[in-house]
């Protein structure tokens, strides 16, 4: 676009130009596998990365490119890569940075699927992880080793909604010449611009707020373009010639978007966790109303939090905007627009009581997703974080009497009444 625009304008227009053939205002779904070369020279140039363009939809596609450009614009990054799922985006990010013999530092209060990837799956390939209290900077510092290649956090933790001190953490991590990675799924780029607080790479499960309607699985990696891979000295894979692509050097030949380009031309090319054009189209539809939806999500959530915090059957509500939350000051600093609509609360009692409340709800759907237009509920200890040991659950702040809510776009009075009736069953 020719000049700088605000978020609400970018979410509707960034990454899209009018289709030159049909003049369609809506973005077409380019449901194709491959693309015709003008001549043999163009084919050679495209494969050698000497010319931008489309070769095969596993690597690039016009519908996906529009989605990637739009989310990059909303995050303030230099480039993005769409993937088949949020876990694919996270896995690609880690595998691009860390190889066999390398090490990761990660927040202990992260999504159960991410925890399992780091603790159980990646060690089989020689990548180990130390889980830390991300709020304890001394503990983070002590965990970083010579072979540590990244520090991984969540902008809003899942499911505790804990908030890292981004600025302080980024300063510490960058002193060790490694990047700070943040899963920005729960926050969205509308509630926080993580790149302005020192994060180098953001990942999303586009399945959540970006799509917004629980219809599509997808993920996306966004590159800030700010990390200096050459000066770091720890990432030769982005600096040295790549023999699989005619000895291209990503830092020399691509520049600021070196990281995200390398992920596309190596990991996506070779392992193929590509987003479908149809899903990209649905995610673009979701982005058009992202700010409006998130505002309503937040408004509903804050009213429900207020109700639950005053209920006699509720032991605790974990929501950073509450005055007594340990994250209240960080919420005020980093999240002036709100801290989203996903949070947990603990009922008085144990697992039996938590299950009874969940099973008594009528509007809330009991399922393992969040950030849908519809309100959702789940019991983290037995579902999303059920693969974790009791000790690991405790370290992540998960207890048997805890319930996670994802507040949707329904009338908030109806949602409060649904919760009131369910809590009366205790």
For the regions a language model picked out, list residue spans one by one.
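PLP-dependent enzyme catalytic core of the Aspartate aminotransferase-like
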Residues: 119, 128, 146, 293, ...
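Conserved PLP-enzyme active-site core in the AAT-like
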Residues: 2, 11-13, 17-20, 80-309
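N-terminal "arm"/small-domain region of PLP-dependent enzymes with the aminotransferase-like
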Residues: 2-61, 69-70, 403
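Active-site beta-loop-alpha junctions enriched in small/polar residues
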Residues: 156, 185-187, 322, 348, ...
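Conserved N-terminal alpha-helix of the aminotransferase class I/II PLP-enzyme fold
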Residues: 39-88, 113-121
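Conserved small-domain helix->loop->beta segment predominantly found in fold-type I
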Residues: 271-274, 278-280, 285, 289, ...
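Short hydrophobic/aromatic beta-strand micro-patches
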Residues: 222, 344-346, 406-408
């Amino acid at each position: 676009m020719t000049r700088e625009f605000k978020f609400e304008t970018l979410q509707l227009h960034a990454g899209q130009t009018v289709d030159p053939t049909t003049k369609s205002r809506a973005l077409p779904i380019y449901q194709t596998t491959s693309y015709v070369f003008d001549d043999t020279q163009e084919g050679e140039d495209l494969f050698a990365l000497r010319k931008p363009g489309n070769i095969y939809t596993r690597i690039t596609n016009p519908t996906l490119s529009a989605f990637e450009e739009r989310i990059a614009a909303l995050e303030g990054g230099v480039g993005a890569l769409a993937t088949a799922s949020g876990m694919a985006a996270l896995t690609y990010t880690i595998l691009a940075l860390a190889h066999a013999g390398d090490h990761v530092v990660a927040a202990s209060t992260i999504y159960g699927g991410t925890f399992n990837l780091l603790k159980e799956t990646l060690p089989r390939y020689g990548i180990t992880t130390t889980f830390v209290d991300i709020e304890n900077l001394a503990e983070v510092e002590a965990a970083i080793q010579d072979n540590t290649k990244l520090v991984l956090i969540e902008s809003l933790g899942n499911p505790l909604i804990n908030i890292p001190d981004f600025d302080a953490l980024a300063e510490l991590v960058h002193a060790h010449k490694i990047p700070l990675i943040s899963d920005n799924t729960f926050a969205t780029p509308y509630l926080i611009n993580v790149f302005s607080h020192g994060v180098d790479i953001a990942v999303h499960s586009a399945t959540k707020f970006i799509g917004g309607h629980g219809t599509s699985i997808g993920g996306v990696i966004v590159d800030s373009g700010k990390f200096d891979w050459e000066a770091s000295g720890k990432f030769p894979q982005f600096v040295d010639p790549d023999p699989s692509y005619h000895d291209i050097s990503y830092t020399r030949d691509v520049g600021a978007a070196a990281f995200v380009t390398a992920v596309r031309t190596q990991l996506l090319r070779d392992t193929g966790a590509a987003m479908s054009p149809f899903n990209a189209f649905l995610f673009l539809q979701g982005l058009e109303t992202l700010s409006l939806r998130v505002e309503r999500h937040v408004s509903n959530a804050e009213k429900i939090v207020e109700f639950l915090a005053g209920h006699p059957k509720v032991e605790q509500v974990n929501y950073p905007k509450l005055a007594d939350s340990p994250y209240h000051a960080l919420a005020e600093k980093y999240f002036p627009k709100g801290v989203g609509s996903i949070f947990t609360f603990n009922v008085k009692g144990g697992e039996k009581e938590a299950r009874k409340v969940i099973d008594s709800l009528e509007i809330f759907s009991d399922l393992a997703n969040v950030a849908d237009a519809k309100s959702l509920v789940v019991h983290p200890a037995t579902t999303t974080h059920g693969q974790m040991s009791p000790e690991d659950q405790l370290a992540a702040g998960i207890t048997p009497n805890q319930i996670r809510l994802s507040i949707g776009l329904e009338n908030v009075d109806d949602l409060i009444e649904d919760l009131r009736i369910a809590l009366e069953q205790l």
